[in-house]
Structures are given as C-alpha cells and as structure tokens.
From Swiss-Prot:
Keywords from the named record: Coiled coil
Organism lineage string: Bacteria, Bacillati, Bacillota, Bacilli, Bacillales
The organism's place on the tree of life at top rank: Bacteria
InterPro entries associated with the record: YgaB
Name of the protein this chain belongs to: Uncharacterized protein YgaB
Coiled coil ranges: 31-72
Gene: ygaB
Amino acid sequence: MSQRVCFMEIEMIKGGNVYTFIRLKEEPMTEFEKLVSEQMKTMDKLLDLQSELDRCKQIEAELRHLERDARLRGIQAEIAVKRKHLADIQDMFQKQTEQVIRSYRSSEKPSSFV
C-alpha cells in the first residue's frame, strides 16, 4: 500500500521562547490520492513527450529550410552556368556577325542571301 508523508507542526512555549517541532508522519494514501498521484505522473510524461515532439518539429523545420537553401544554391549554380553559356554564344554570334559584315564588304559581288 502506498504511503503519504504528512507534516505535523507542534509549537510549545516555554520560558518565553517558542519552540516549533515538525514531525513527519506516514499515513496510507486514499484511493483518490493514489489516482491523483498517478495522473500527475502521467501528466509529467505527457509534458516531457510534448517537449520532445516540439524539439523534433523544430529540427525538422530547420532541416527543411536547409534543404531549400541547398536546392536554391543548386539552381543558382545552374543559372550561373547557363548565363555563362549564353554569354559565350552571344560572343560567338557577335563574332560571326562581324565576320559576315567583313566578308560582305570585301566581296565584289554581294551574295543574294544578304
């Protein structure tokens, strides 16, 4: 049977001094007290588990954010490569245009395509 600890306080006055005695007394717990005690233990477990769950959710959110950042960096790198490729093609096109113009100017008879 579960026991509960009760405090009994006794005050004595002797010779103008107050003496306080505290006595611990163990008594059997009532059914109600047992149920409340068990419920409090369960509540502690619930609170601990909720705290752990919240911590895990926060970690999950941080990981998702990091994953998005990684994907963003990947896309940004791909964009940079495509921009470089585009600039290279634009340079090539510009050089081809200049070559076509020089060829046109140097030819005696222009081609029917121009």
